[in-house]
């Protein structure tokens, strides 16, 4: 059974955690991402054209509440206060904090 994870922060470390989770679906299910001031199109761009890992080889897109990766919807939250992120709404069991704030 895959571990349900959420990612808080989507800079370099958050995107690395994203790629690891997406590349191992048997181990991880990415069920949410929190980005302060989220811009969904920019998130997709940053995933697609990574200067370290190269071009993302899957399907990427956006929908009204988040991004799609290989046909799977991942909700994106835009909370500045970590205590207000609704992780329970997506079923996250573990949160990767990639903000550097904690």
Model-predicted segments: where are they?
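N-terminal Rossmann-like NAD(P) cofactor-binding subdomain of oxidoreductases
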Residues: 1-102
